Amino acid sequence: MGSSFGKLFTISSFGESHGGGVGVIIDGCPPRLELDINEIQNDLNRRRPGQSKITTPRNESDEVEILSGLLGNKTLGTPIAMVVRNKDHRPKDYSEIKKTFRPSHADATYQKKYGIQASSGGGRASARETIGRVAAGSVAKQLLNKSAKTEILAWVKRIHDIEAEIHPSEVTFDEIEKNIVRCPNQSAADLMIQRVEAFGKEGDSCGGVIECVVRNPPIGIGMPVFDKLEADLAKALMSLPATKGFEVGSGFGGTYLKGSEHNDPFLPSDSNQLKTATNNSGGIQGGISNGEDIVLRVGFKPTATIRKSQKTIDEDGNAITLKATGRHDPCVLPRAVPMVEAMVALVLADHLLRQRGQCPD
């Protein structure tokens, strides 16, 4: 219940932050897809903790083990099971707060819903759960690239009040990965890093916005009316930990425009491809991809677990003062970049297979 996603290209994630490991089972991946296992590991490396001075110091190698579904590097069409073992979990870091409700964390709501919670490391509410998503998303990215030459890139657009000027059509992977904050605008990245470090030293945290572009998306994917492409993207991305907002194309900014300003005029073309003069729609019209770049943004709140003293209650409702210990990201955004890419890829791969099934021509 709640740990599976997709209709044809489906995933089920499992594991807790301080359990034996975390992983995913992919069902519905087409057979004979040749996978680059190094790409899966590289995406996990971009997500893993301890990779820079502005991420949690938890030291995990996050080496993926593929248990089933492949013959050599080719998919069999059977379930693909992948797992990453937890090696650096420290339950003792949570011994003093295991009966405490951290403000804005999932502790309280998990307890109220289930009557029990994984008090060590946040359990399923931990960002460590996303390891399975990133691994599965890497498979989905390879499927999309081989099927339609689709490229999915995400980057940090804003941290706190520092926003970068970025043109989605021009961003490259190397520009994104050249600094530890994963912002392709270097001058803005330098300021972002300083801001995250400053808040971390204060025992505080900050949030921001990740932007994502899909180039060469499959045309015509999306299922009206309840499975519109942007609706499924919103659900997928808002299922990531710490997300609080989603927009596609012009987003909320488009509400300030007139129709004559916002409409994307179609251009004459000799090919069967749709071309528009502008892209305020963000590559999606009527819930269906039109072939233009899909551009979207996701808002992430500040990390809930901080070292500053906060007023809260324990499981019995008693007022207490909490000063959290343990290892936590002062800002989740640099590590969330591959998570966003993964969830976008999973949605697109699922809709690609659904489109092939309904409209094979």
Curated annotation (Swiss-Prot):
Amino-acid biosynthesis listed as a keyword: yes
Claim: Amino-acid biosynthesis is one of the keywords in the record: yes
Cofactors, names only: FMNH2
Entry keywords, A to Z: Amino-acid biosynthesis, Aromatic amino acid biosynthesis, FAD, Flavoprotein, FMN, Lyase, NADP
Pathways involved: Metabolic intermediate biosynthesis; chorismate biosynthesis; chorismate from D-erythrose 4-phosphate and phosphoenolpyruvate: step 7/7
Positions with a binding annotation for NADP(+): 47
Pfam families with a match to the protein in the record: Chorismate_synt (PF01264)
EC number(s) per entry: 4.2.3.5
Binding annotation for FMN: 124-126, 286, 301-305, 327
Taxonomy, superkingdom: Bacteria
Reaction catalysed by this enzyme: 5-O-(1-carboxyvinyl)-3-phosphoshikimate = chorismate + phosphate
GO cellular component, one term: cytosol
GO molecular function terms listed in the Swiss-Prot or TrEMBL record: chorismate synthase activity; FMN binding
Cross-referenced PROSITE patterns: CHORISMATE_SYNTHASE_1, CHORISMATE_SYNTHASE_2, CHORISMATE_SYNTHASE_3
Biological process per Gene Ontology, one example term: amino acid biosynthetic process
InterPro entries per UniProt: Chorismate_synth, Chorismate_synth_AroC_sf, Chorismate_synthase_CS
PANTHER family in alphabetical order: CHORISMATE SYNTHASE
UniProt function note: This reaction introduces a second double bond into the aromatic ring system.
Family note: Belongs to the chorismate synthase family.
Protein name: Chorismate synthase
Organism of provenance: Prochlorococcus marinus (strain NATL2A)
